[in-house]
């Protein structure tokens, strides 16, 4: 199996699908984690978006491009909301909605009236830079003191993803690519490969966020139980004396 763009795309799709399945299994056990529900839905939407890329050879390209990018935008918004929910920070609905709407509108403009693969890739890269930077900023700015380790590690992963897409903004698209993303050239291939590794790292970062949050909750519950026993101990001793 040669390591070309279509092969790596298939591997990336299988990876995203496996991560989505794994988070779904976690959700069966950790049903009380609202952020996990949002992240799981986001990962399934990401896998659906990549499915639309794989089907472009069998179905009309223009509707699939619009559908895939709309689903991708919704996936990013849910991931963003999941981070805000994990940090217990309010996030006005209109802010990510405006960002996602502007992204989808840009894709529609450069796939229907003015088809241009290079501009579409730049629009997608700019959207990814903004969303990942937003999540990294929230994790650094609003990290609870007892959860800073996992929040800062996750922020580093999101920041690395933002850097990759920022670099992609300046990379050229192969002149003979036309409207085919699989022929975009070696520089785009390199950023896609880096994105696969960062997607795996993001999966572990999200799990670390959940684990540290549960550890903090367990320590808090243990302290509460200890205080409760300490308060009850004198009355219990008096009852023994009686």
Where are these regions (language model features)?
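Juxtamembrane segments at transmembrane-helix boundaries
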Residues: 19-36, 48-182, 189, 194-199, ...
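Interdomain coupling helix/linker and adjacent catalytic-core signature
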Residues: 223-242
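Hydrophobic transmembrane alpha-helical segments in integral membrane proteins
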Residues: 1-19
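Juxtamembrane membrane-water interface segments that cap and precede transmembrane helices
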Residues: 1, 182-183
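Heptad-repeat alpha-helical coiled-coil signal-transmission segments
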Residues: 204, 211-214, 218-225, 229
């Amino acid at each position: 199996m040669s390591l070309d763009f279509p092969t790596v795309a298939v591997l990336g799709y299988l990876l995203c699908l496996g991560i989505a399945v794994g988070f779904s299994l976690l959700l069966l056990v950790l049903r009380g984690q609202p952020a996990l529900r949002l992240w799981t839905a986001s990962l399934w939407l990401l896998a659906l978006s990549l499915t639309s890329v794989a089907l472009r050879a069998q179905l009309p390209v223009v509707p699939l491009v619009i559908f895939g990018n709309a689903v991708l935008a919704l996936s990013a918004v849910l991931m963003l909301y999941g981070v805000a929910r994990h940090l217990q920070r309010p996030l006005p609905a209109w802010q990510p909605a405006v960002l996602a709407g502007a992204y989808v509108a840009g894709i529609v403009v450069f796939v229907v009236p003015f088809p241009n693969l290079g501009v579409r890739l730049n629009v997608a890269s700019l959207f990814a830079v903004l969303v990942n930077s937003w999540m990294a900023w929230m994790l650094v700015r609003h990290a609870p003191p007892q959860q800073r380790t996992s929040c800062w590690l996750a922020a580093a992963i999101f920041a690395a993803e933002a850097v990759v897409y920022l670099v992609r903004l300046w990379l050229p698209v192969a002149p003979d690519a036309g409207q085919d993303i699989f022929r975009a050239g070696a520089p785009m291939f390199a950023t896609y490969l880096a994105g696969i590794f960062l997607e795996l790292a993001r999966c572990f970062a999200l799990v670390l966020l959940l684990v540290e949050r549960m550890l903090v909750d367990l320590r808090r519950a243990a302290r509460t139980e200890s205080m409760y026993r300490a308060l009850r101990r004198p009355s219990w001793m008096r009852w023994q004396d009686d």
